Amino acid sequence: MDQLDLHLFWELLPLKGLGPIQFLSEKTDVQLYDKILGKIIAEEHENLEKRKQDLQDTVKQFSQFFSKEDLKIAIEALEETIGNERDDISTTFWGSGISLEYKADQLVEIFADDRAKLLHFQDIPIFSAEPIHLIGEISKQLNEIPLIKDEEVVFPKHHLFLFSFLSEQVDGQYCEGSKKNRSISWRNSPRTHAVNLADYQPLKLF
């Protein structure tokens, strides 16, 4: 791909995806971009039925220590923890700093860390721009006031989450966060088991 194509590829598109990769794309379609995304360095899978079976096998193996009631309680806890929303979830970690989460092999969330150096929002580099400028421009373009708590900035309507770009202070002010652990994620729908935003405060940038 030439530079223009790479620039278009690495554009963060809230509610839509990453460049040509749209939310709800099939995993096999996304893998066509492996030359840009880099090597797959790890994969994780969450499958409720498999976890149940693993639990049953463990209980059977150590039956002298566990009762049927213990198994029932453990499975109920597992169902509550994972639930239908987290069932059949897989995450692919790429060498470029991008992680892609799928539900039933359809893309539902994109995560990026500072290895994704070409990632940008409307020509503003995500990981090298001044955080206040970046978040301010995102706020303007999306016409949404972000919220902040500790080191997380959230654009709730656009399901966009920035971590460690800004840090909330005790006096209600904020300062630049640590560059070391900076990351960003975005979705086209609300997070499963979303954090209650009642404790988050509007971020006054202007």
Model region roles, listed by residue range:
Residues 1-206:
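Short helix/turn-capping signatures at newly exposed starts of structured segments
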